[in-house]
Each structure stands twice: as structure tokens, then as C-alpha cells.
């Protein structure tokens, strides 16, 4: 399944607020009535897991195949599969740029990376899925236009506190990955265990 490029409001209306996809809040909807039949209960449980999976896909802007690969990697690692899955997604370069406040959304961050505006440890990296590590520092190429855009984004989107695993120097225009983030620093309301359950027969 390819990356979604359709209307973003339609997605957040169905799944709720997804800050990585759009900075718009989900519209308030009236709670739907719940059917108490046994068959519908089974369907609803599947739907809940499906929607949690879709939240991850759309928030981080990844394909179904990419998400499945991340789940498989997380399953092979030691520790909580769900937490490791979130760490893998959060340490993607496009997400780090977004969490630093350099762009308003993850698609915006991906565009900067694809256009070769981003350097990691002084080297151009044009792969949005690049996995950042502790002590990596993120800078932008010395181009007046990109610096101007990012400076405006920083000023506006860093009103909320940056997560503890990251720091940003406005003077040097440099972001730093301090450490692997903990569960409390995830920038999305998500039940990752339901995502792991969804993929239990595939990963």
C-alpha cells in the first residue's frame, strides 16, 4: 500500500488528532451508538486494532509494508515490542526534524530531506527513514531560503516544549539527539499493544 496523499482532514475526522500528519485538530463528533451483538463485538475489536495501526501509519507517514517491517524488527529485539516499535518510528530522521520544530508536519520534514537540505553530523542525508542515533546532530545546508523557512517554523512551532530526548540550539541552528526516547515522550496518543496484536499473525 502506497503512502497516503489525499485529504488530511478526512483522516483525522476518522482517527483523531495526528500532529505528524497535520497541525489541525480533529473535529468533535457525536459518539456513535454501540451494537451489543456478539458478532459486532468481534468486528469492533478488529476495528479498534485496525484504527490504532492506521494512526501510526498516517501520523508517521509510512506505507503498510514499512510499518510491517518495523514490527518485525521490533519483535526480534529484546524488550517490549510495542515500545521498541515506537522508538524505531520516533528515531526516523523525518520525525526528528518534526519533533525539533523545524517543520510543522512530518510530510514537510520529508520534503526537506528529499530536497537535500538536511545534514546529519555534517553530511547530507536524503533518506527520510534514516535511523538517528544518540549524539547525532541535525543541521541545514547553508541556503538562505531554507534557513529562513526553518527559522520561522522554529519560532512558531517550538512554543510547546521539545521532548527530553532532543535539544535545539537557535544560535547554532542545530538539533541534537540526546538519547533514545522513553514511552512518555511519544508525541502521539496511541495504544501500541493493539498495533502489535493486529500484526500478530503477519510479523
Curated annotation (Swiss-Prot):
The keyword Lyase does not apply. Residues 91-159 form the S4 RNA-binding domain. It is found in: Plastid, Chloroplast. GO terms for biological process: ribosomal small subunit biogenesis; translation. InterPro entries: Ribosomal_uS4, Ribosomal_uS4_bac-type, Ribosomal_uS4_CS, Ribosomal_uS4_N, S4_RNA-bd, S4_RNA-bd_sf. It holds the Pfam family Ribosomal_S4. The keyword Ribosomal protein applies. It comes from the Eukaryota. GO terms for molecular function: rRNA binding; structural constituent of ribosome. One of its GO terms (cellular component) is small ribosomal subunit. Gene3D superfamilies: Ribosomal Protein S4 Delta 41, Chain A, domain 1, RNA-binding S4 domain. Its main location: plastid. Keywords: Chloroplast, Plastid, Ribonucleoprotein, Ribosomal protein, RNA-binding, rRNA-binding. Part of the 30S ribosomal subunit. Contacts protein S5. The interaction surface between S4 and S5 is involved in control of translational fidelity. NCBIfam families: PRK05327.1, rpsD_bact. Belongs to the universal ribosomal protein uS4 family. HAMAP family: Ribosomal_uS4_B. One of the primary rRNA binding proteins, it binds directly to 16S rRNA where it nucleates assembly of the body of the 30S subunit. With S5 and S12 plays an important role in translational accuracy. This is Small ribosomal subunit protein uS4c. The gene is rps4.
Amino acid at each position: 500500500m502506497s503512502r497516503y496523499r489525499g485529504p488530511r482532514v478526512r483522516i483525522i475526522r476518522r482517527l483523531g488528532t495526528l500532529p505528524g500528519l497535520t497541525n489541525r485538530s480533529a473535529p468533535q463528533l457525536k459518539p456513535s451508538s454501540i451494537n451489543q451483538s456478539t458478532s459486532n463485538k468481534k468486528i469492533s475489536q478488529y476495528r479498534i486494532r485496525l484504527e490504532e495501526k492506521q494512526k501510526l501509519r498516517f501520523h508517521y507517514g509510512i506505507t503498510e509494508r514499512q510499518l510491517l517491517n518495523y514490527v518485525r524488527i521490533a519483535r526480534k529485539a529484546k524488550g517490549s515490542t510495542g515500545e521498541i516499535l515506537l522508538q524505531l518510528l520516533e528515531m526516523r530522521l523525518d520525525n526528528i526534524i518534526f519533533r525539533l520544530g523545524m517543520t510543522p508536519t512530518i510530510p514537510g520534514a520529508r520534503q526537506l530531506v528529499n530536497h537535500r537540505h538536511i545534514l546529519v553530523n555534517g553530511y547530507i542525508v536524503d533518506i527520510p527513514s534514516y535511523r538517528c542515533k544518540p549524539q547525532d546532530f541535525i543541521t541545514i545546508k547553508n541556503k538562505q531560503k531554507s534557513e529562513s523557512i526553518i527559522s520561522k517554523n522554529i519560532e512558531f512551532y517550538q512554543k510547546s516544549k521539545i521532548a527530553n530526548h532532543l535539544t535545539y540550539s537557535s544560535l547554532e541552528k542545530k538539533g541534537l539527539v540526546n538519547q533514545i526516547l522513553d514511552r512518555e515522550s511519544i508525541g502521539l496518543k496511541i495504544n501500541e499493544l493493539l498495533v502489535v496484536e493486529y500484526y500478530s499473525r503477519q510479523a
